[in-house]
Amino acid sequence: MGKLHSKHACKRRENPEGDSFVVNGFIAKRAAEEDERYGNNLKDYKNEELKDGRLTLLHCPLQVVLPPEKAEGCESFLQYLSPDDGERDAQKVKKRISLQDLECNVSLAEDNRQEWVFTLYDFDNSGKVTKEDMSSLMHTIYDVVDASVKHSCNTKRRSLRVKLSVTPEPAARRRDATHTERETSHLSQVEPVRSEEHRSADRRQSTHIRGQTEAHEGNHYCVDENTERRNHYLDLAGIENYTSRFDSSSPDADQDPPSRSSHSQSRPHSQEPETHVYQRRSQLIEPCVAPDPRLRTGPQLIRSRSPKGSSRFPGVIPNVTKTSKCHGHHQPIPTGQDVYHLTQQNHTHAHTPSGLQHSHSRRIRSRAREQQALTPVKNTNATALVQRHEHHHHHEHHHHHHYHHYHQT
C-alpha cells in the first residue's frame, strides 16, 4: 500500500511527558493545496458581484422532491382519476376522504370493514385465567382472522387491526346487574341499621352509667323532687293540689334497695287519698288521754321544721327532748291490748310515711288539734306515742325538703 492509503501511525515516545500523535505529512500538504486553490477564488470576487456561471461547481438545488403520499384503501379509486373529469371528481374525492380523519394504512370506507364475533363457552369455568390461556386465545383469534380477512386493492402490505372485548351474555349481564344492584342496595340498607344499633346501644349504655352515678350521688332525694317541691310551695301559698291527691300508688315500693328504702318509700305512699290519712290520725287520737297542759304549749303547737327547732323553746319537758334532736323517742309503756295495737300500728306507719301528709300537713294538723281539743283523753303514755308519730313524719319531711326549710323560722 502506498503512502496515500496508509493509516496514521501512533508511535509511543520514550519521554515521561506522554504519547504523541504523528500525522503523515503528505495528507497535510494536500489539504493545504486545496485550501489555497479555493481561497484564491473567493478572494478574487470579494469586492465584486457574483455573476452567473462563475461558480458552477458550487451551485446545487436546495429543494427536496418527495413522492406523493397514498392511502392503501384508496389506491384503486385514485389511480383511475383523470384530469379531464375536473371539479366533479374533486368534489367526490372530498366527500370520500377526510384528511383530518385519515390514518396511515387504514381504510375509512364502510364496505371494507369486517367484524368477527367469537363466543367462548365456559372460558372461566374454573374461575382462574392464566397468561397461557390468554396467549392461546389470541393466537387462535389471529389465525382465524388472518385466514378470513379480505384485503382491498390486492396490495402487498397486510396490516391487521384486531379489537378484543370480553363481555358476558345478555341474560347473564342482566342477572349480574340486578344481583349487584340488590347487593349494593342491601348493603346500603344494612349500614344505617348497624349505625342505628350502635347508636341505640351507646345511648342505653350512657343512660345506664348516668343512672348509676345519679343513684350513687343523690340516693337520699325523692324520685320526683320537682313535683314535691311544687306541691309544698302550693300548700304554703294556700292552694290545694288535687292532682297528687287522687293518684294511684305505684307497686314498686318494695323492690327498692335497702340503702334507699328509708328515704324513697315516701314517694309510692305519698299518693294515697286523704281519707285514709285522716282515718289513721283519728284512730290514734280518739283513745288517747288529755296531755299535760305544759306539753300543749310551745313546740307542739308551732312545730318547727328544722332539726334544731324544738330545742329553742323553753317550755319543753327535759325527759321528752334529751334522746333526740326534736321530740323524745322513748318507748311508751303498753297499758292494755289497745295500746299494744296502737304501738304496732304506729311502727308500721313510722316506716311508711306518706308524702301527702307532708304536702297537706298544715290542714291535717289543724284538724288534729281540733279533735284533741274536743276529745277527752286520759292516758299520758298515748300522748308520747302521738308525739312520736307526729315527730317521725316531720323528721322524714325534713329529709326530703331540707333545701328550702332554712328560710322558715
UniProtKB/Swiss-Prot annotation:
Keywords: Calcium, Cell membrane, Cytoplasm, Lipoprotein, Membrane, Metal-binding, Myristate, Wnt signaling pathway
Principal location: membrane
Disulfide bonds: none
Family: Belongs to the NKD family.
Entry's Gene Ontology BP terms: negative regulation of canonical Wnt signaling pathway; negative regulation of Wnt signaling pathway; Wnt signaling pathway
Region (Disordered): 166-224, 243-315, 346-367, 388-409
Binding-site residues, Ca(2+): D122, D124, S126, K128, D133
Segments of skewed composition (Basic and acidic residues): 171-185, 193-224
Lipid-acceptor residues (N-myristoyl glycine): G2
GO MF annotation terms: calcium ion binding
Subcellular localization: Cell membrane; Cytoplasm
Gene3D superfamilies (UniProt xref): EF-hand
Purpose: Cell autonomous antagonist of both the canonical and non-canonical Wnt signaling pathways.
Skewed-composition ranges (Basic residues): 389-409
CC per GO annotation: cytoplasm; plasma membrane
Positions with biased composition (Low complexity): 247-268
Annotated protein name in UniProt: Protein naked cuticle homolog 2-like
Domain annotation EF-hand: ranges: 109-144
